[in-house]
């Protein structure tokens, strides 16, 4: 049974999800998702949003349940902090400063930059280093620059299995790269957005902080539910677990597999000992 986070039409309204852009700024491709116009502002049909949001969350749940990685993308000012906070909360990855061309399609080069970032971190953290204060300041400057660009993906370990995007117009390069690599894209689409290339569209306000916060939180909650379900299915008690990062999840699953293997080996040894004792007892009875 899939336990997706619950939400109501009231939640959408209170978050301002239904407010689009000025009617003059619309993208005609969004017509199927628009309810009408009020005070020259397009109003999004929330009945469509409810259905499509549930579809998107279910798809996301299934991807994460299979231990897929999700990349949150939102580099506009009002989305940046929320994107980072919610991605970290559910143990996933994010880009919230600037999308560098080739982040997906040229992953090998990005991996080298990630390696360089980790090297700078080790140099700075090493208390026994022999570098001068000036050299350390230079390292920190380079580290900070890399961290702003790729800090949110430095532990991703490979291409993501899905993208969650706020503002498809601003993040169109990321979407094109994902499309090229057949990585599914889940995105909030405002009335000025182009739905082309979006596998799971969610019609909604992608500008207001409350709306962005609502979408990011419910996506994060869905990912957490999928992770908990996966761990519970493997017999792991999820009560008290606060770190749901992919690394921690893999550690828990490996430890659980070792425990099962040890228990199985111990059970086999016990059975062998019991059989040995039975044979000895049986043999002594036959002799008498």
Curated annotation (Swiss-Prot):
Family, per entry: Belongs to the universal ribosomal protein uS2 family.
Protein name: Small ribosomal subunit protein uS2
Record-linked PANTHER family: 30S RIBOSOMAL PROTEIN S2 PROKARYOTIC AND ORGANELLAR, SMALL RIBOSOMAL SUBUNIT PROTEIN US2M
GO cellular component: a single term: cytosolic small ribosomal subunit
Gene: rpsB
Highest taxon, organism lineage: Bacteria
Disulfide pairings: none
Keyword list, A-Z: Ribonucleoprotein, Ribosomal protein
Gene Ontology molecular functions: structural constituent of ribosome
Region (Disordered): 255-288
GO biological process: translation
